[in-house]
Amino acid sequence: MGNSDPFLTYLKSFGYSVVRLPRIDIRPLQVLVREDTRLTRLGNLETILHPGPQVALPRMTENIAAANISGERTRDLSLGVGLSILGSVIGAMGGSQMGLDVSYQRAKTVAFEFSDVLEDRVDLADIDQYLTNADIAAFSSHAAKLLEADSIYVTTSTIKSRKFIVQASETSGSPIEVKLPEIQKLVGAKVKVAAAGKSNSKIAYEGEQPLVFGFQAARLFYEQGRYTAFKPMEPGAGAFEARQAAADYLVTDSPFVRLDIP
């Protein structure tokens, strides 16, 4: 059964899982490992699985215009979920989220629109060929055990943007207008706040750097020290979730899975 948490699944229709606290340092070809209920970022793929003599590390294609996501709108989310997402975005931009609930106090629902979305990706077919020829690093004895336990995942695609557009609506479904100067003062100078339409009902929040807000990953399967298969992670089945400064978490539809990022 899939996860029904609207926070975890609001990108599912676009084929991505959610980064609860958007970051700049999530990218393809990063290795995640699952131990019991914890997923920890282990390092880069080539550090754990050295390139073989015939197939080099796959080339990552960066900053591809994600036309299937740019300009698209999420479904209406509850005010609490929407403000939680918006707060995490503003926080990642270096702004303050204190007082946002007051600015949107008349709202019942919130929807997001993604602008100028860029994708970084590596084709799974290339990763498949690389892994078939790669060798487990000689000094990665623990990683070898984790591979045999099918506990390793690799990120394959990330989506990022500098600008996130928000539209809030009241119970009747009518958009509500907010006070731009008031919100700009609340969030601070690091976040640019501007109307994204003819009225102040659709607001664009823009930061200085593109933030990764969605990702795709694949689980790797090994047998007797050799790679055998991969399985793409189902969109919406997990999400990066920041719980404290030094740790992130991956939430799944089964027990909570913690993702620590050094």
Residue ranges: model-predicted function:
Residues 258-262:
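Short acidic DE-rich linear segments
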